[in-house]
């Protein structure tokens, strides 16, 4: 069999291998500023910052960070939603020689405390409405300086003025800084671009601590060096064969604190000198739709939940928006259903393809071709310079052939250096240059890969094996079902049994029996859910992954409260 059967299915123009320049990640920003100086880098509610301006501002911030004691290798936190300030903070940190640590704005004080202490960061750049939370956490950490920005600083003058009048205080954005803390605006304005520290920052210097989403337990700090991020940025750029540098508009709704938004959204856009339309709240579908139409967005990285929301929006059905400028979208983080893909492509005329990656490969390893085959259920082909194998679950070494199910292992220039402070986890995950993903998968004869499920989420009812994803994929084909989550729950007879949690489409009703009957000729008897629970929504990560373990926790809690 061909060693890399996937290469023959690459789109025309996608190289088998790429030459990666030995440069720091911010080289792409400097190059965009040089080649496309007047192209907007960010657009936020109408306010634009060009690539020339972004390069200069981030130089100034780097000088400011150096002034407050940030040295090469220091970890620096970012705690903000998708705004121009996030991008300024990220590249300012890298230019100062720092290591960016992006934090989820939805995290609790306990979760933030864990990240801050684990990473050892001492300086944090935050949006003002999160300042109070950081000050609560600060005494339990080594944070010494908080650099604060207000969302209105990224807005056009008139909107900034109106925001100050109507929403600033109510939204918690108006804050008084404690001694030792500083406004980001002041830190930038104190310096000229030429003040940036003169540092030797190379491809093997650490650029990012990316904390994994924690869908399978405690959040782990992935260490990525500049060459990892440079490589994946270029792999994605070369995959997007219909993209023209300096002429694209990226809708940045996918959160930047997540590695998918950070690399496939922001880094890709900077390399392509694409204008990023910043969407701080991805659930604000009206903002998403208006932004696509107003700014003629052409690239829209997202998750299935986002594309579904557009597909089912009443104003889209009523044809109130022109979405025809969309030409390329990569969907990640959750399975992309064929119905979602076909409907979205029909509405926009663009391409929507499923990709795959992890925090440990910041960010992508596989993607379906934009113009070639897209087999239903496939995560696609390994990207340029990525090797992938399916290995035996028994000995974790034997390479399996097409159609056989085992663990997906990958190797490529984007694979992380390791986990921070977790040598055992690192040794278990990285073996002889191969990353053991923990995902159960198969590869077909043509080199397309398919995820079967997470290794840790296998359900074993009475000794059988049930992969939750297989059951979920059947359930979402029911005409009344919008979303499905499946997991194993304790069962006194079988030890464990299959439970499904369903969200129905608007206005629909269904019964447990109806769902079980629907599954009867599509699944083996032991795979059919024993329990079906209908919900208004399912717990998810910020990028739309269903949290199966949270569903199980809620189930156990409810069972414990039942009378004996």
Language model regions located:
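Conserved AMP-binding/adenylate-forming core of the ANL superfamily
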Residues: 21, 38-83, 87-91, 108-113
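ANL superfamily adenylate-forming
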Residues: 7, 133-203, 314
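AMP-dependent adenylate-forming
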Residues: 4-7, 27-50
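Conserved AMP-binding/adenylation subdomain of ANL enzymes
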Residues: 230-249, 259-298, 313
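Adenylate-forming
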Residues: 81, 126-136, 149-157, 254, ...
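Conserved adenylate-forming
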Residues: 65-70, 191-204, 209-252, 274, ...
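Conserved AMP-binding/adenylate-forming
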Residues: 248, 274, 279, 328-329, ...
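AMP-binding/adenylate-forming catalytic core of the ANL superfamily
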Residues: 126, 300, 412, 417-418, ...
């Amino acid at each position: 069999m061909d060693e890399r059967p996937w290469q023959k299915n690459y789109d025309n123009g996608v190289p088998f291998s790429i030459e990666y320049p030995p440069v720091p990640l911010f080289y792409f920003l400097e190059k965009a500023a040089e080649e496309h100086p007047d192209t907007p880098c960010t657009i936020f509610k109408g306010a634009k910052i060009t690539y020339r301006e972004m390069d200069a501002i981030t130089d100034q911030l780097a000088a400011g960070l150096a002034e407050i004691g940030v040295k090469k290798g220091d970890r620096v936190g970012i705690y903000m939603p998708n705004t121009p300030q996030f991008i300024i903070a990220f590249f300012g940190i890298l230019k100062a020689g720092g290591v960016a640590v992006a934090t989820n704005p939805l995290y609790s004080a306990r979760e933030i405390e864990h990240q801050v202490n684990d990473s050892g960061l001492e300086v944090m750049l935050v949006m003002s409405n999160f300042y109070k939370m950081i000050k609560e956490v600060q005494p339990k950490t080594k944070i010494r300086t908080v650099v604060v920005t207000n969302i209105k600083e990224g807005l056009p003058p008139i909107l900034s003025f109106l925001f100050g009048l109507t929403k600033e205080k109510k939204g918690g954005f108006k804050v008084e800084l404690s001694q030792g803390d500083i406004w980001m605006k002041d830190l930038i304005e104190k310096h000229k671009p030429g003040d940036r520290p003169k540092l030797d920052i190379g491809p093997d210097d650490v650029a990012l601590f990316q904390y994994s989403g924690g869908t399978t337990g405690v959040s782990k700090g992935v260490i990525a060096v500049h060459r990892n991020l440079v490589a994946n940025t270029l792999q994605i750029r070369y995959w997007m064969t219909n993209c023209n540098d300096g002429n694209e508009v990226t809708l940045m709704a996918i959160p930047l604190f997540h590695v998918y938004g950070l690399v496939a959204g922001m880094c890709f856009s900077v390399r392509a000198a694409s204008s990023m339309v910043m969407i701080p709240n991805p659930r604000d579908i009206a903002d998403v739709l208006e932004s696509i139409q107003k700014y003629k967005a052409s690239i829209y990285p997202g998750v299935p939940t986002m594309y579904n929301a557009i597909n089912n929006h009443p104003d889209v059905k009523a044809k109130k928006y022109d979405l025809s400028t969309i030409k390329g979208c990569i969907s990640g983080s959750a399975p992309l259903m064929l119905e979602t893909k076909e409907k979205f492509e029909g509405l926009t005329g663009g391409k929507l393809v499923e990709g795959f990656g992890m925090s440990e490969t910041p960010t992508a390893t596989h993607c379906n071709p934009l113009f070639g085959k897209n087999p239903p259920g496939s995560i696609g082909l390994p990207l340029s310079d990525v090797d992938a194998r399916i290995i035996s679950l028994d000995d974790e070494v034997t390479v399996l052939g097409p159609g056989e199910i085992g663990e997906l292992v990958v190797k490529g220039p984007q694979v992380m250096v390791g986990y921070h402070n977790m040598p055992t986890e690192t040794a278990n995950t990285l073996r002889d240059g191969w990353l053991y993903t923990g995902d159960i998968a198969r590869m077909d004869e043509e080199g397309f890969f398919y995820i079967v499920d997470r290794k840790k989420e296998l359900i074993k009812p009475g000794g059988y094996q049930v992969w939750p994803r297989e059951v979920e994929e059947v359930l979402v084909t029911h005409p009344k079902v919008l979303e499905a989550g499946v997991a194993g729950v304790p069962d006194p007879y079988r030890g464990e049994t299959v439970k499904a949690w369903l969200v129905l489409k608007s206005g629909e009703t269904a019964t447990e029996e109806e769902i079980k009957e629907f599954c009867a000729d599509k699944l083996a008897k032991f795979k059919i859910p024993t329990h079906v629970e209908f919900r208004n929504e399912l717990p998810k990560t910020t990028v739309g992954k269903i949290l199966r373990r949270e569903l199980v926790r809620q189930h156990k809690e409810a069972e414990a409260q039942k009378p004996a």
